[in-house]
UniProtKB/Swiss-Prot annotation:
This is Shikimate dehydrogenase (NADP(+)). Shikimate binds at residues 21-23, 68, 93, 108, 228. GO terms for molecular function: NADP binding; shikimate 3-dehydrogenase (NADP+) activity. Its EC number is 1.1.1.25. It comes from Thermosynechococcus vestitus (strain NIES-2133 / IAM M-273 / BP-1). CDD domains: NAD_bind_Shikimate_DH. The gene is aroE. The lineage of its organism: Bacteria, Bacillati, Cyanobacteriota, Cyanophyceae, Acaryochloridales. One of its GO terms (cellular component) is cytosol.
């Protein structure tokens, strides 16, 4: 942590709640490693205070900030510009300054793709099942579309919300499945992505797919759970027991954060330092 002075530059993250964010740990480790007089702090911003908070961050000369739940979509009207990618996703998670004012972009797509790009898959032959239809699912759909995946299935509990989610992607053919139908396509699925909070601490005994469900997947399938606490989730434990390749959400958190830092600083982020900081922060959380 740098010695705070009148020259210290400010970065941060806004959300509600915000007390459990791991972003300060990885960003401050990176800033210290780079020898920069910056500090990254969390800001608890309630939805009804979002507009005031954005104006305040600008007035205080904050260099840039991340955006987390529940502001990723509602922040859009408060920005001077939004990147094409963020418009496609419909959500912003990173904001930086320009001559016009605040510019919003989305590094969640990059973060999600980082571990997948290391796989030797023929993505045009891959069918994907996305569990959930929230903001994280939007980033996942965009990423899978960019990869060129053959089919994308979306499963959720509420028929109306599921239909609205599918209708919001006129350029992409999505296949909706009600939650009770989510296991019906597994025999042809090569990538399963859980974007729901099912299995997240403290509800660690829950899983969106059972061992019986996972047994229907091809032996080469990948199971990707965006949750990173606990590690591993019950879903990933069951997938590993089945011999499937797995990823958790820590890689996504790391790489979206590294991409955000590069927007703010204009230089490569020390991802190895950030990864170590994340592992340490997770290990010391009670």
């Amino acid at each position: 942590m740098p010695k705070i002075s009148g020259q210290t530059q400010l970065l941060g993250v806004i959300g509600d709640p915000i007390e459990h964010t791991l972003s300060p740990a990885m960003h401050n480790a990176a800033l210290e490693y780079l020898g920069l007089n910056y500090v990254y702090v969390p800001f608890w911003v309630k939805p009804q205070q979002l507009g005031v908070a954005i104006a305040g961050l600008e007035a205080l000369n904050v260099v840039g900030f991340n955006v987390t739940i529940p502001h990723k979509e509602t922040i859009l009207p408060y920005l001077a510009d939004v990147s094409d990618l963020a418009q496609q996703v419909g959500a912003v998670n990173t904001v930086y300054r320009s001559e016009k004012g605040w510019v919003g972009t989305n590094t969640d797509v990059h973060g999600f793709l980082a571990p997948l790009r290391q796989q030797s898959c023929l993505w045009s032959e891959i069918a994907v099942l996305v569990l959930g239809y929230g903001g994280a699912a939007r980033a996942v759909v965009t990423a899978c579309y960019d990869l060129g995946c053959r089919q994308i299935y979306i499963s959720g509990r509420q028929r109306e919300r599921l239909g609205a989610f599918v209708a919001s992607w006129p350029q992409i053919t999505l296949h909706p499945l009600l939650w009770s139908e989510r296991a019906t396509c597994l025999a042809k699925i090569s990538l399963v992505v859980n974007t729901t909070p099912i299995g997240m601490s403290p509800h660690t005994g829950a899983t969106p797919l059972t061992a019986e469900d996972l047994a229907k997947l091809p032996a080469t399938a990948i199971v990707y759970d965006l949750i990173y606490k606990p590690r591993p989730t019950l879903l990933l434990q069951l997938a590993m027991a089945r011999g499937l390749q797995t990823f958790d959400g820590l890689a996504m958190l790391l790489h979206q954060g590294a991409a955000a830092l590069e927007y703010w600083l204009g230089q490569p982020a020390p991802t190895a330092i950030m990864a170590t900081a994340l592992e340490t922060a997770l290990g010391t959380e009670k």
